[in-house]
Curated annotation (Swiss-Prot):
SUPFAM superfamilies linked to this entry: MurCD N-terminal domain (SSF51984), MurD-like peptide ligases, catalytic domain (SSF53623), MurD-like peptide ligases, peptide-binding domain (SSF53244)
Cell location: Cytoplasm
InterPro entries from the UniProt entry: Mur-like_cat_sf, Mur_ligase_C, Mur_ligase_C_dom_sf, Mur_ligase_cen, Mur_ligase_N, MurCDEF_pg_biosynth, UDP-N-AcMur_Ala_ligase_MurC
Protein name: UDP-N-acetylmuramate--L-alanine ligase
Keyword Cytoplasm: yes
Annotated gene: murC
Organism of provenance: Citrifermentans bemidjiense (strain ATCC BAA-1014 / DSM 16622 / JCM 12645 / Bem) (Geobacter bemidjiensis)
Reactions performed catalytically: UDP-N-acetyl-alpha-D-muramate + L-alanine + ATP = UDP-N-acetyl-alpha-D-muramoyl-L-alanine + ADP + phosphate + H(+)
Keyword Kinase recorded: no
Length: 461
């Protein structure tokens, strides 16, 4: 960036998408400040790296900033945004700052309604194993790094591309991965056709020497293939895919499959994340790695050492014979995939699910899809909707969803609003051999951590 820009301020710096960019900028030598409503492990890490963190939003926080970066969750009436405009300080979306970082490297952008974080993490892990030393900006904590960002010395930047507000169109990657296209963020998009149009525009932004990596198993991607004008390769379980998986085996937290490229057997891949959906994510990572001439043996080694991603079927702990697992899944497609993975890998275990719906708008738009998403849950408990800054919508409640799921035929469904009562209910319900799965993009993970403490205390008493 032009040398006159020295101090960069982030409004909502504790968010997973914002913090990664902030960390890379700190490591590049920029002065970084940011504000958030409360402290967290993320803000503590940024402070340890030299960032200045303010708690609460106030006009004076931007006094010395040369540019202010905001996420889509920050509104125009935020006092820091208002003050920045008064001071004629540029206010830009996080995607524009990510685009600026990507402009200095060869960008690998991973987009898609689902699977972005896991796929980005797999790509980053394999490229690192291959000696490419990429800069990494991920929307989740890569367990092997203990963070979601890293400044590499190589020529590539691997980043997650967020389609939620269309701002991923600001990016200009050399390699664009699209894991799937599904109906989501219908508070921003008019419907699936506009979503498909936007992804086509994203894919066609790559340069003539670039590559698009596209999942052929996804019907919406298959629909738009005739509109793709740039070089692409495909992946999936389909026999027509360029990169294909066969002999998929799911056992516990382990997944293995045999990878093929254009009919040629490459070899077996094994990694420690459950689920057939993660086989697809792995195929995308293989396609990217082979485009960069990383030997398949190195790719195998990268997957063998892949430690997974925070909040993606993450084992939090075990007590009294009960495993506590947390997952970020909050869309019906993600929920079905996660519960299916749990059932496939742990067929003998009872699955007790605590789901926290995320956003009133998503719950309303995808209500009937949510109703059908929990078939593989043996016990289902819903807690109140996490608003993520949205105002309530009349009639759209977790209680209404629980009632509808019950009428759909799910037998053991409960709605509990109060967290203490929810944990007390879980203490009565859980038994040795169960898997307790907390599910959602809000703060439902706290239920799992509380239950681990209670289960351990019960064991010691």
């Amino acid at each position: 960036m032009y040398g006159k820009i020295e101090r960069i301020h982030f409004v909502g710096i504790g968010g997973i998408g914002m913090s990664g960019i902030a960390e890379v900028l700190l490591n590049l030598g920029y002065k970084v400040s940011g504000s958030d409503l409360r402290g967290s492990e993320i803000t503590q890490r940024l402070e340890s790296l030299g960032g200045e963190i303010f708690f609460g939003h106030a006009a004076e926080n931007v006094a010395n900033a040369d540019v202010v970066v905001i996420s889509s969750a920050v509104h125009d009436d935020n006092p820091e945004v208002v003050e920045a405009h008064l001071r004629l300080i540029p206010v830009i979306p996080r995607a524009e700052m990510l685009a600026e970082l990507m402009r200095m490297k060869y960008g690998i952008a991973v987009a898609g309604t689902h699977g972005k974080t896991t796929t980005t993490s797999m790509v980053a892990t394999i490229l690192s194993k291959g000696g490419i030393d990429p800069t990494i900006v991920i929307g989740g904590r890569l367990n092997s790094l203990g963070t979601n960002a890293r400044l590499g010395q190589g020529q590539f930047l691997v980043a997650e591309a967020d389609e939620s507000d269309g701002s991923f169109l600001l990016l200009s990657p050399t390699i664009a991965v699209v894991t799937n296209i599904d109906a989501d963020h219908l508070d921003f998009y008019s419907g699936i056709e506009e979503i498909k149009d936007t992804f086509v525009e994203f894919i066609n932004k790559i340069p003539f020497y670039g590559l698009a990596v596209l999942c052929l198993d996804n019907g919406n991607i298959a629909d738009v293939l005739p509109r793709v004008k740039k070089r692409f390769t495909s992946y999936g379980m389909s026999a027509q895919a360029d990169f294909r998986a066969t002999d998929v085996k799911l056992s516990g937290f382990s997944t293995s499959f045999v990878a093929h490229h254009k009919g040629v057997r490459l070899g077996e891949i094994t990694f420690s994340m459950p689920g057939a959906h993660n086989v697809l994510n792995a195929l995308a990572a293989i396609a990217v790695a082979m485009e960069l001439d990383i030997p398949f043996e190195t790719i195998q080694e990268g997957f063998a050492g892949f430690g997974g991603v925070g909040r993606r079927f993450h084992l939090k702990g075990e007590a009294n014979g009960i495993m506590v697992v947390d997952d970020y899944g909050h869309h019906p497609t993600e929920i079905k995939a996660t519960l299916g993975a749990a059932k496939a890998g742990f067929a003998e275990n009872r699955l007790v699910v605590v789901f926290q719906p995320h956003r009133y708008s998503r719950t309303k738009e995808l209500f009937e899809e949510f109703v059908k998403a929990f078939h593989d849950a043996d016990v289902l408990i819903l807690t109140d909707i996490y608003p993520a800054g949205e105002a309530p919508i009349e009639g759209v409640t977790a209680e209404a969803l629980a009632n509808r799921v019950r009428r759909h035929g799910q037998k053991d469904v409960t709605w509990i609003s109060d967290r203490d009562k929810l944990c007390e209910h879980l203490e009565r319900v859980l038994a040795p051999g169960d898997i307790l799965l907390t599910l959602g993009a809000g703060n439902v993970w706290q239920v799992g951590e509380t239950m681990l403490l209670r289960l351990k205390a019960a064991k010691e008493s």
